[in-house]
Structure formats: structure tokens, C-alpha cells
Amino acid sequence: MIGLKQLSDTLLNEASSLAQLRDALNAFTQRCSDVGGILPDRSFNAWAGDALLKNGVAISPAAAAHCVNDTQRSVVFIRAVYAAIKAAQARFAQGPVEILYAGCGPFATLLLPLLGRFEAGELTVHLLDIHQRSLDSVDLLISDFGLQAHHISCTQGDACDYQHPSHPHVIIAETMQKSLEQEPQFAVTANLAPQLHPQGIFIPQQIEVDLCLAKLNEETAAVKRGDTLDSDALIAAGQRHRLATALCLIPAQAATLQQQASQNNAGLLELNPMHLRMPTTADLSDFEPALFTRVQAFEQHQLIDYEWLMVHGSWLKGARQGPRGRIGWFA
């Protein structure tokens, strides 16, 4: 049975192989499932126990547990969280560092493996999730991993409108699907970022969604073969055309972007439509409009095209091809 020291040593070690990282996360998942009683399930569908919120979908505890299996995503964010906490300790030397982890899921994956590296009293941790079942699981894990001496509280609530009583030094909010299409990452960021301490750290620091014309079938096939794709090289070779940055979500600007959004007939917020002119010098018959999501979790800890399951290129819904080669896209 894996312990927190062995787990965090493996996950934070840049020399760990992909197989070692995967094995460590699998062992963590198995222990968490055995203790908390929640088995990972990738069933992202209407019967999965998801919570339908006004600002998106809060996936079920079982689906959230399955996200641990996205190895690169989990490792990059865990390393980012550790680096952010160490940076916060340097900034707020009087301590303790206050952390709010929104959408923690049943395993608190991005933080729990790290807590054993800190002394009790160094951190004050607030865990927030819409599902009480997830919080019940985390509570069992805190006891099982021997973390009772740490200052950890659990709150059931919607991160889209949750109001924290203080200004945390670190906020972790990783509640996204590809291209931010379902889970409420945008609304969560817009609500929580203004509550951050002025010198605090928000994770992720930036999410960028690029609108491109791409040969998605070819790119996906190449990735499945094990090829490494370089977006800049694809663009230089004319195999992908970058049209625009559809969205750049920076925590400090999220609330303003939300205020500028309009409400559609269904009562949902929509960003302003984009109208783009298609390239005229290339044969575009084999290309399709697609969105690519890139994430800067913290400083050098980043996820780019095809490095993780949620940022694979996604076919663009809501694209309208208009006269003179223009595309109108509605977020």
C-alpha cells in the first residue's frame, strides 16, 4: 500500500518515467477507492450522477475520481500546486498559508498527496465540493493517511457562487473539460479569483483556447501512433491554420469577461461572437474548425496540445461559415 512520502517523491521527481508516474497514481487511486468507497468511472453522460449547475456540469464523484487516470494532467497540476505552495510560503513568511481547493473531488488529488511534506500548522486547507459524497470520501482519506493534525475543513457548496470568509493565499480550481465546454471553469474562476489575496496565487494561472483549422483525424491518428506533434511545426508546414485566440482565461480578468457576456434565450451566458476571415491562399477542403486548449498551471508547469486527455483538439460546435469565407463562432 503506497504511502504519501513514496507517492509524492515519485510524482515530484522530474526523472520519474511515465510508467512510474502512472503506477504511483494507480496505487493512490486504488487506496483512495478502497478507503472512500468510490470507484473511478469515466461515464460522462446523463446517468453518471453529474450535478447540472446554472454555469455548467459538476461531474459525479466517480467521474472525478477517473480524472486521476489522466496521468500528465494530474502530475503537472500536482507539481504546480507544490511549487505554488512553496512560493506562497516565501511570500507569506508569517504563515500559515491558507489554501482553498474548489472542486476537490473524492480524492483531493491535486493536494492530498502533498500534505505529508508539510508540518501540521504550516497550511490551513479548505476543501470545497458540490457533492457531499466526495467530501465524505476525503474525510475518510484524511484519517487513513494520518493527516488529522493538519488544519483541514470541508465545505459542501457550488464554487460558482461560494463566498469564502477570508482571502486565501492559494486557490486551486481545476474544473475543466476540453475547450471549457461543460464544466464551469470560467464561472468558478470569475467567482473565486476576486476573493484571492492580492499577492496570492491562482491555479491555473492561464487557460488559452485557440481557434484553428486542423486535420483532426490525421493529428489524432498520429498521436495514437505515438508521434509527437509540434503545433508551430504544423502551422509552418501548412498542416494547421491558427485563426485566433478564442479565449484567454486569466483569473484577474475573468470577472470582467463574465460581466461583458450576454445572456442567450436559454438563460446561459455567452461570450461575444467572433467573426473571422478564412485563409484564402490554401486549399482548405481537408480542414475542419477546431479548438485547442493550453493550460499554464503555475509558471513552467504547463499542458499543451495532446499532452493530456482534455486538451485534444475538439471539433468546433457552433461554427457558421458565411459569405466570402468568413466564420462566425459563438462561445
Protein language model features and the residues they cover:
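Class I SAM-dependent methyltransferase Rossmann-like catalytic core
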Residues: 50-89
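Phosphate/oxyanion-binding active-site loops and adjacent basic polyanion-contact surfaces
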Residues: 66-81, 103-110, 130-134, 181
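Conserved SAM-binding loop of SAM-dependent methyltransferases across substrates and taxa
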Residues: 105-121
